[in-house]
Amino acid sequence: MSEYRIEHDSMGEVRVPADAKWRAQTQRAVENFPVSGQRIERAHIEALARIKSAAAKVNAELGVLDEDVAGAIQEAAGEVAEGKWDEHFPVDVFQTGSGTSSNMNTNEVVATLATERLGRDVHPNDHVNASQSSNDVFPSSIHIAATAAVTRDLIPALDHLAGALERKAGEFADVVKSGRTHLMDATPVTLGQEFGGYAAQVRYGIERLQASLPRLAELPLGGTAVGTGINTPPGFSAAVIEEVARATGLPLTEARDHFEAQGARDGIVETSGQLRTIGVGLTKIANDLRWMASGPRTGLAEISLPDLQPGSSIMPGKVNPVIPEAVLMVAAQVTGNDATVAAAGAAGNFELNVMLPVIAKNVLESVRLLANVSRLLADRTVDGIVAHPERAREYAESSPSVVTPLNKYLGYEEAAKVAKRALAERKTIRQTVLEGGYVERGDLTREQLDQALDVLRMTRP
């Protein structure tokens, strides 16, 4: 039996692997783009298939396709959406900028599967791609996949992380520690206040995503080649988007302006920026956790993180903050992905952006990485954090910054002298004030001194 079969397209004949569900145009793309070995994301394949199914249904309702052909296409597209044929999507991410190769890959696989079901030919262009163009289908598929990933994966993952941080904020509400600005001692805070701040960062990330969703969920579907809707029957655009929204359960809407929606990718660029902001926030959180857990003997050691794996191939007993480090790498990747999306988003000329596949790859990867690492950070680090209250309080009470409440009794300059003397003589602020005769002179009473130097009270003025 031959290892190949002959397929043809408008450019002629092409040899295709005998068992491949794709056809000529996909094979040409495979041969033209052996670039990275990276294929489009699973979520993206699903989104393309959802469009093909919805389009077939609406085309049948509008008299463009026969019912049996449309039914076969819907069944085939359903299997593709479920992931049963992912190995038949071999086209590299770095391909034609409109995503035509991946759109045709979808058309051809669905056409082959539908032909097998129907017993007669289903054409990838005339039937599966009816009333469509790569120029409206592919950007729509990006927005569908990204909307699904953000709403179903990333937002729940961030909510999970925020909840873990909020629980720790409550647990550590009375654990007083030295505040730090510029990595230098500052007035006291509680560990709970810091964790509450981290939780708020994550919650605000969710708010940012939700704010960008209305534009992310707008689809140019139905605009076909240049946004005019040429070759579509009346009512197709609204009907097909309504069907995709129904089938996916996503809050998808028709683009308010099809020319903006095909010529520009501002909605997805905006979302990528929100993803970068979330990554920046996670970087801050992860670094703070690493600093507070540094040690065990020569660092801050205010908290302990769960021990997850040996940290060194040469130093026995060493354990490292591996999850926070993974978070930092994800954040760096997301920042780089956003730079790519920004550059690619600027690549629109007239009626079409021509860097769509790389936009899709980077945005969907960012969502996936952030969602995964947020869950890991919550489950394998935050939930297991243990505070060391005595150590934290010792730092807070020994910090020269606790002199700050004495400003109103001694004045700023005299309080500064106290702080410098305490540092130079390696004494506490309390010792220095008492030995300096400030109480004896009547600058303040011992009771006022006690209240002023109550480090927990300083966190709740």
From Swiss-Prot:
Any GO BP annotation: tricarboxylic acid cycle
Domain of life of the native organism: Bacteria
UniProt entry keywords in alphabetical sequence: Cytoplasm, Lyase, Tricarboxylic acid cycle
Gene Ontology annotations for the cellular component aspect, listed alphabetically: cytoplasm
Positions with a binding annotation for substrate: 98-100, 120, 123-126, 133-135, 181, 313, 318-320
GO molecular function, one term: fumarate hydratase activity
Reaction catalysis annotation: (S)-malate = fumarate + H2O
Subcellular location: Cytoplasm
UniProt cross-references to Gene3D superfamilies, sorted A to Z: Fumarase/aspartase (C-terminal domain) (1.10.40.30), Fumarase/aspartase (Central domain) (1.20.200.10), Fumarase/aspartase (N-terminal domain) (1.10.275.10)
Pathway it works in: Carbohydrate metabolism; tricarboxylic acid cycle; (S)-malate from fumarate: step 1/1
InterPro entries reported in the protein's UniProt record: Fum_hydII, Fumarase/histidase_N, Fumarase_C_C, Fumarate_lyase_CS, Fumarate_lyase_fam, Fumarate_lyase_N, L-Aspartase-like
Broad class of enzyme this protein falls into: lyase
Active site residues per record: H182, S312
HAMAP family linked: FumaraseC
Entry's family note: Belongs to the class-II fumarase/aspartase family. Fumarase subfamily.
Subunit-level organization: Homotetramer.
Note: There are 2 substrate-binding sites: the catalytic A site, and the non-catalytic B site that may play a role in the transfer of substrate or product between the active site and the solvent. Alternatively, the B site may bind allosteric effectors.
Protein's UniProt name: Fumarate hydratase class II
